Amino acid sequence: MSKKVLFIVGSLRQGSFNHQMALEAEKALAGKVEVSYLDYSALPLFSQDLEVPTHPAVAAAREAVLVADAIWIFSPVYNFSIPGTVKNLLDWLSRALDLSDTRGVSALQDKFVTVSSVANAGHDQLFAIYKDLLPFIRTQGVGDFTAARVNDSAWADRKLVLEETVLNSLEKQAQDLVEAIQ
């Protein structure tokens, strides 16, 4: 059975720079693991009032995470922090699957997670937040995170061009993630 890596792209915009980075990371994983992308665009804002019955979008996100061996988050920087959409997703996924045991296993429990980001500033702050958050929600951070800036021409033509050093970093990140789940 093939190992599975779930990609979470933090920008819901079609063709976002972080989605373009994810496509490059997918190339680095080609032939090594099965990659899928999580569509969490229908996820409601977290509220305990919505936990029972389980919202279909929450159930689908949990199922996708449960069958994955690892998660790779591609996160823009919004005001030097995690995008609200990603934080909301992690809030849902970190909740105990059995609500009668609030410290019980979650969909994210012990998952291997790595993070990459395309943004023009704030990578250090963003990565520090993820490095604090990931162990708190009982995941295992893997390897060094990859940061990239948006090339100037991308603002006009919407085409991200990653520098060779970034592509090499994504290759190393992919290798570290594959090794973690073997």
Residue ranges of each PLM-predicted region?
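N-terminal beta1-alpha1 ligand-phosphate binding loop
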Residues: S2-K32
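Glycine-rich phosphate/pyrophosphate-binding loop and the adjoining helix
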Residues: L6, Q140-Q182
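Active-site-adjacent alpha-helix of alpha/beta-hydrolase-fold enzymes
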Residues: E24-L29, K131-G141
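Short beta-strand elements in bilobed, periplasmic/extracellular small-molecule ligand-binding domains
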Residues: V33-S41, L45, Q140-R149
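N-terminal beta-loop-helix "entrance" segment that forms/cooperates
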Residues: D39-P56, A154-K159
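Helix-loop-strand module that forms the ligand-binding subsite of alpha/beta enzymes
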Residues: P56-I137
